[in-house]
UniProtKB/Swiss-Prot annotation:
Binding annotation for Zn(2+): C73, C76, C89, C92
InterPro entries tied to this protein: Hydgase_Ni_incorp_HypA/HybF_CS, HypA/HybF
Name used for this protein in its record: Hydrogenase maturation factor HypA
Lineage, highest ranks first: Bacteria, Pseudomonadati, Pseudomonadota, Alphaproteobacteria, Rhodobacterales
Organism listed in the record: Cereibacter sphaeroides (Rhodobacter sphaeroides)
Gene field: hypA
Function: Involved in the maturation of [NiFe] hydrogenases. Required for nickel insertion into the metal center of the hydrogenase.
GO molecular function: nickel cation binding; zinc ion binding
UniProtKB keywords: Metal-binding, Nickel, Zinc
One biological process term in Gene Ontology: protein modification process
Disulfide bonds: none
Chain residues that bind Ni(2+): H2
PROSITE patterns registered for this protein in UniProt: HYPA
Family of this protein: Belongs to the HypA/HybF family.
Amino acid sequence: MHEMSLCEGIRGIVEDQARRHGFATVKVLRLEIGRFAGVEKAALGFAFDVVMRGSAAEGARLEILELPGRALCYDCGEEAAIQDRFDPCPLCGGGRLMPVGGDEMRIKDMEVQ
């Protein structure tokens, strides 16, 4: 389950930010996760609760915001939102697409005290 290692990375970031900015508790942590990032949300939620024990984020509410998949179409030259990596271009129907977004994962923000 790679969600556990993702949460370990998040914990490291939270602990670093707590030291830098002097907060003791994270109330809410918001993640932006791309549609194609390959992250199982339920597994991430479980791993988050386990990995954050004993940290500033213990008991924090995890909010996941899904970012859309995006691709550049080589047929029409436009960038468009796609639901699946193998979808045709929604603008022209072309099949030559290069994904340009939707595989990212980042901490958007945290509510702290």
